[in-house]
Regions:
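C-terminal catalytic histidine-bearing segment of alpha/beta-hydrolase fold enzymes
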Residues: 409, 413-476
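Short beta-strand element of the alpha/beta-hydrolase
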Residues: 215-226
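N-terminal glycine/threonine-rich, aromatic-flanked beta-hairpin/loop signature
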Residues: 44-83, 525-527
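N-terminal cap/lid segment of alpha/beta-hydrolase-fold proteins
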Residues: 138-215
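Primarily recognizes the serine-hydrolase "nucleophile elbow" in alpha/beta-hydrolase
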Residues: 281-371
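Short beta-strand/loop motif that positions the catalytic acidic residue
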Residues: 377-379, 383
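Surface-exposed, flexible coil segments in extracellular/virion-facing regions
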Residues: 501-515
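Short amphipathic alpha-helix adjacent to the substrate-entry channel of hydrolases
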Residues: 234-254
């Protein structure tokens, strides 16, 4: 009985080369309808067989078969079918069987019959034909790999809307480009400029890809550094960060904010708070005008260097309850108001998905409890401007003036220790023996660290758009036995999803799950996943063992 079942399975292959046995045709040929690139399968006596042939000639067919089961691995077993006149010789598993077969090729499969030989009156040959057996044609799943938007360059051209006004406020200045002056020289020159304030129109430059049909894109706001005293949205680093991410499909912006402070008391801290108020207003402006600029407000990010890093962190984590005492009304100072009360009157709520912190710091680690925002940081362990640990900024000032006008701050190291304790998604990159402004060289030109920061930030933000759960995982999950019959992705908000396999066969797909069988002796075992999400981005993952 077992031999008959196997004959049933293999016999149809030989018929691809023969005429109909019942009609007595003696010719053999290769059917043009035969698909040599895929499998044919049939369920016989509760067992499913998959067959595929690889070599064909006029009188001979060779291929392999496997039996589908609940086992993780299957063995491919070879077979050979030869035509002998009207009959066929099937060889498999060290068996040789003589039979006669007929087959009708259909678009979606095959209809097969086989015959057994007998004698009439012990003299004449008699053929007894089996019932028809239907073999379905295996349709290999289509596989399309989409461009990895947000991880690779997908747009050649970008455009910039310059000097978009997002608000106005009273301040000293909002732009102070400088390349050669030392910080002390700048502070000295700026003393006269802080005698009185004036109303400032605050602006941003918005970068976006050209030819993008997507209506809602993630947004990154970049904030320049300069100790809340100098800097400009057109600084080379901020411009290049904006361009880099815009080429990958983001909308980005480089923002100017109020700068300047009097070199006394808590003025520096108040300047940092004014910067936060302005940047908060800039983000409210973006949220209100999201449809104008094609921005997805579910994916808002901020990044900055030095003072810009400080402001990015405060934007994500500081709340009005955490306002520095110096920002409230005192004998010498007016109340600066709540975070969202300045610069423009837009009412809009938002939360940041992640922050790119480049050598920034915070005044209080407790503010990190206020948000689930993820953080990636870059910091030199020899930074004397914004120390990586808990210390006073500007340690290169003479006579320890910094201890008189500044407060100690928590650098990237304690920030990430705290984030790890809180279970936040975080990533810290420490540069050994490196000081401040890691992304430029001695001549103030962008260096290799700039590229490193771009690549690592790209991957980190990509992980926010495509969380770890999107990756292929086995069912059940296991760390040691990666070969499983079932796999899935937790991505539910997809437009299209495709699976592919090497070293096995996909035998079933449902929603976000796939069922496979692996060939035990395959040179490579790899499962591939490609997704087009509702964000318009392509996601790709491989599961290999």
């Amino acid at each position: 009985m077992k031999s008959r079942i196997v004959i049933l399975v293999f016999g149809f292959i030989a018929i691809f080369m023969s005429c109909t046995a019942k009609n007595g045709g003696g010719s053999f040929w290769l059917s043009d309808d035969l698909d040599t690139t895929t499998y044919y399968y049939s369920k016989i006596n509760d067992t499913t067989y998959y067959l595929k042939f690889e070599k064909l000639c006029d009188t001979k067919a060779e291929g392999y078969f496997f039996v589908f089961s609940d086992d993780v691995y299957v063995n491919k077993e070879n077979f050979v079918i030869e035509s002998k006149g009207k009959n066929h010789i099937v060889k498999y598993r060290n068996n040789t069987v003589k039979t006669r077969i007929q087959c009708f090729v259909r678009e979606n499969g095959l209809v097969v019959q086989y015959a057994t030989f007998g004698k009439v009156l012990g003299i004449f040959n008699k053929l007894t034909w089996s019932e028809e057996i239907n073999f379905k044609k295996y349709r290999k799943p289509t596989f399309v790999k989409y461009p990895a938007r947000y991880k690779e360059k997908v747009f050649d051209k970008i455009e910039v809307k310059h000097d978009v006004v997002y608000g106005s406020a009273e301040g000293y200045w909002d732009s102070y480009p400088t390349e050669t002056e030392t910080y002390i020289e700048i502070l000295t020159k700026g003393v006269l400029s802080t005698v009185s304030k004036k109303n400032l129109d605050l602006k941003m430059d918005i970068y976006y890809p050209v030819g993008d049909s997507l209506e809602k894109r993630p947004f990154i706001m970049f904030i320049h550094g300069g100790g809340f005293y100098i800097g400009d949205k057109k600084s080379e680093a901020m411009v290049e960060y904006c361009k880099y991410f815009a080429h990958m499909g983001y909308v980005t912006a480089s923002v100017n904010y109020r700068l300047g402070f009097k070199p006394m008391g808590p003025s520096v801290e108040r300047a940092g708070y004014r910067a936060l108020q302005d940047i908060h207003a800039a983000m409210r402006f973006i949220v209100k005008n999201a449809s104008v600029y094609g921005i997805d407000t579910d994916y808002l990010f901020a990044g900055g260097s030095s003072a810009g890093g400080v402001t990015s962190l405060n934007l994500a984590f500081m709340r009005n309850k955490n306002r520095p005492e110096s920002t409230t009304k005192g004998l010498l100072y007016d109340d600066l108001g709540n975070i969202e009360s300045s610069t423009n009157s837009i009412k809009a709520e938002f939360s940041l998905k992640a922050v790119i912190n480049m050598w920034g710091a915070v005044n209080d680690l407790e503010i990190l409890k206020n948000s689930q925002t993820s953080v990636i940081s870059f910091h030199g362990d020899a930074d004397k401007i914004v120390p990586i640990d808990y210390d006073y900024p500007f340690q290169d000032m003479k006579s320890q003036i910094n201890t008189l006008i500044l407060f100690k701050m928590y650098g990237s190291l304690p920030i990430h220790i705290k984030l790890k304790e809180l279970g936040r998604r975080e990533e810290l990159h420490i540069f050994e023996n490196a000081g401040h402004s890691l992304n430029v060289d001695e001549d103030n030109h962008l260096n290799e660290n700039f590229k490193f920061i771009c690549y690592k930030s790209r991957d980190f933000l990509y992980g926010e758009i495509f969380p770890e759960s999107y990756k292929i995982k086995s069912i059940p999950m296991t760390l040691f036995h990666r070969a499983m019959p079932l796999y899935e992705t937790n991505c539910k908000d997809y437009v299209k999803m495709f699976w592919d396999i090497e070293g096995g066969v996909i035998v079933g797909m449902k929603d976000n799950q796939v069922r496979v069988v692996w060939f035990e002796n395959a040179h490579k075992h790899k499962l591939k996943l490609s997704i087009l999400t509702d964000t318009g981005a392509g996601f790709y993952d491989e599961y290999e063992f």
